[in-house]
Regions:
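Active-site mouth loops of central-metabolism enzymes
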Residues: 57-78, 128-140, 173-174, 206, ...
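N-terminal binding-site loop/beta-alpha segment at the start of enzyme catalytic domains
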Residues: 3-122, 155, 186-187, 193
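A short, structured active-site edge motif that brings together acidic residues
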Residues: 120-132, 162-163, 229-232
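Beta/alpha (TIM)-barrel catalytic core signal, keyed to glycine-rich beta->alpha loops juxtaposed to Asp/Glu
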Residues: 165-364
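Aromatic/hydrophobic pocket-lining residues that form the small-molecule binding cavity
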Residues: 80, 106, 141, 145, ...
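Conserved, mostly hydrophobic/aromatic
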Residues: 42, 54, 87, 95, ...
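CE4/NodB-like, metal-dependent polysaccharide N-deacetylase domain
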Residues: 140-161, 190-194
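Short, acidic/polar
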Residues: 70-87, 137-151, 208-217, 295-300
Length: 364
């Protein structure tokens, strides 16, 4: 979503001297220890979920790019298989996809990779991504769900989300048209009762009134949310609304979910990769405190520290990203109060640049 300084974000990225990647630290040069992965328990089901979740939105394509940006090159299925195998072998078990990801190819690629493993060894999260008005009818939305099962080669989804509640030109109207007026949310509740959906939740962007309505329904017992997915990182914790008045600070979103006991899945822990590419003077501050810790790992540790977080998603195109993130969560070293204060100061520094980068989520 475009922030108050987002028009200048490209200038921020190109004009300042930024580190685009850290050299591997000695720790990251070693093989990650899968036996040390941090897990969180889902209080609703008892699922033992890896704190690091695989976001299947930036799958590699032939030629080495990301399937999110390149609509022409085919998905590199062999590489997807290798990375999924590596993730599972090193303790990861949560894979998040959508009919909308990688120009509609993510679910199929994810299904091919995961189907080669025992179904009980992983959790699949996918979404009812009925963004287009052509998919708002009950029948079209039902078919989208059924197609997800076919593409993923499974007869049930572990975690099913209403995709992006709160977005659109008229967010409340679109929420009702996509999920309520057509009866599709009630139908999804019925599918859950049949075992075809194990956990039913939503991902949220945009209009806080829709988020608050969903939680009011939860409080009233009208609909029970088993989990929810929000954007959370150390910049958005206090500055999401300052950057863009359409957005809401992550602290509020997390607290509202956590006090209700709703497990939280985190997206955008790196703000679309931007928190791994900060100005050199911020890199220097981070390295002065933790010379062996990468810039990105600070953000991943922050996102994984709150006790109500079930999983932190990372869209990992390259094996090196997967390895580094496995190191960060095997096991997680929670952010200390002193480190939290340090990151809040870093967030102040970034915000005061007044060129806060767009995270390229494309929901706008």
């Amino acid at each position: 979503t475009m922030g108050s300084g987002a028009i200048a974000s490209s200038a921020w990225l190109s004009a300042c001297t930024c580190r685009t990647a850290d050299r591997k630290t000695p720790a990251e040069s070693r093989e990650p220890d899968g036996s040390q992965m941090t897990y969180r328990a889902n209080p609703n089901t008892g699922d033992r979920v890896s704190l690091l979740g695989y976001g299947m939105r930036r799958l590699p394509v032939e030629g080495g790019a990301s399937g999110r940006e390149n609509s022409d090159a085919p998905i590199d299925q062999e590489m997807v298989n290798r990375q999924v195998d590596y993730a599972l072998a090193h303790g990861m078990n949560y894979f998040d996809t959508s009919p909308a990801y990688c120009q509609g190819r993510s679910e199929r690629a994810t299904g091919i990779a995961l189907h080669r493993h025992p179904r009980s060894s992983y959790f699949i999260a996918t979404k009812l991504s009925n963004f287009s008005p052509t998919t708002w009818s009950r029948r079209a939305s039902q078919e989208m769900f059924e197609n997800s099962l076919r593409e993923l080669q499974t007869d049930y989804v572990d975690y099913l989300l209403l995709h992006g509640i709160g977005i659109g030109q008229k967010p409340m109207d679109e929420f009702y048209q996509r999920y309520i007026d057509n009866g599709i949310l009630d139908w999804l509740v019925e599918q859950k009762s049949k075992g075809r959906i194990r956990n039913l939740g939503f991902s949220y962007h945009g209009d806080i009134r829709v988020f608050d309505l969903a939680l009011r329904w939860h409080d009233e017992g009208k609909y029970h949310w088993d989990f929810a997915q929000i954007e959370l990182n150390y910049l958005d914790w206090h500055y999401a609304n300052e950057i863009n008045p359409r957005n809401t600070d992550a602290e509020y979103l997390y607290d509202e979910l956590h006090k209700r006991g709703i497990p939280v899945v985190i997206m955008e822990p790196l703000l679309g990769g931007r928190l791994a590419r900060v100005p050199d003077y911020i890199v220097a501050k981070m390295k002065s405190r933790e010379p062996e810790q990468s810039v990105a790992s600070w953000a991943f540790r922050f996102a994984g520290t709150p006790e109500g977080v079930l999983a932190v998603l990372s869209g990992m195109t390259y094996m090196e990203h997967l390895r580094e993130n496995l190191h960060t969560y095997s096991p997680l070293r929670p952010i200390t109060p002193e480190e939290d204060a340090f990151l809040m100061q870093i967030a102040d520094d970034i915000y005061n640049l007044k060129t806060i980068p767009c995270n390229e989520c494309n929901y706008c």
